[in-house]
Amino acid sequence: MYHDLIRSELNEAADTLANFLKDDSNIDAIQRAAILLADSFKAGGKVLSCGNGGSHCDAMHFAEELTGRYRENRPGYPAIAISDVSHLSCVSNDFGYDYVFSRYVEAVDREGDVLLGISTSGNSGNIIKAIEAARAKGMKVITLTGKDGGKMAGSADIEIRVPHFGYADRIQEIHIKVIHILIQLIEKEMVKA
């Protein structure tokens, strides 16, 4: 009954991944991001991750697999997803939703830490403000974006962009794969002397 729709969805996902893989700069950006994160951890730094909606879930997934585990047992790595409901509701109420991530960055981060901002459109005002706060603290910034990068284009030390202009779920599918690869590479970097 739905076989054609299922095949169509899976083929579109495969095409989106194939298009992403065609650009070697994407592979290079993933490698550079993993090394940047591992170097921060080795120097006593941490990563804060943030996003909205499905990207918020990706930010939490990223932090959880760093502090918990990915495929193998190993020490936890310092990662925090900005997801504390009391913080989010307080700042939303008192300052506005655009400040929910930047206030946390201002309070918790320091030079040497890394911010991972995830936005399929690249236009999330609260992530843009978090990037600005991170820059003011002397932090490094990695972004996972889509389409043309939106307003976040060019704002990060490393941008990993999925150049897909259709529905956001296709971009999110690549983002979660990138997140898993980042963790795998971080684990390899962390065991190096």
UniProtKB/Swiss-Prot annotation:
Main location, first listed in the record: cytoplasm
Annotated SIS domain residues: 37-193
Amino-acid positions noted as binding substrate in the UniProt annotation, renumbered to this chain: N52, G53, G54, E65, N93, D94, S119, T120, S121, S124, Q172
GO cellular component: cytosol
GO terms (BP aspect): D-glycero-D-manno-heptose 7-phosphate biosynthetic process; lipopolysaccharide core region biosynthetic process
Catalytic reaction(s) noted: 2 D-sedoheptulose 7-phosphate = D-glycero-alpha-D-manno-heptose 7-phosphate + D-glycero-beta-D-manno-heptose 7-phosphate
UniProt-listed Gene3D superfamilies: Glucose-6-phosphate isomerase like protein, domain 1 (3.40.50.10490)
Subcellular location: Cytoplasm
Pfam families per UniProt: SIS_2 (PF13580)
Positions of Zn(2+) binding: H61, E65, Q172, H180
The EC number(s) this enzyme carries: 5.3.1.28
An MF annotation (GO) of this entry: carbohydrate derivative binding
Keyword presence, Membrane: no
Cofactor annotation: Zn(2+)
InterPro entries: GmhA/DiaA (IPR035461), Phosphoheptose_Isoase (IPR004515), SIS_dom (IPR001347), SIS_dom_sf (IPR046348), SIS_GmhA/DiaA_subfam (IPR050099)
Misc. remarks from the entry: The reaction produces a racemic mixture of D-glycero-alpha-D-manno-heptose 7-phosphate and D-glycero-beta-D-manno-heptose 7-phosphate.
Subunit structure, interactors included: Homotetramer.
Annotated HAMAP family: GmhA
Protein name (database record): Phosphoheptose isomerase
Protein source organism: Yersinia pestis
Gene name linked to the record: gmhA
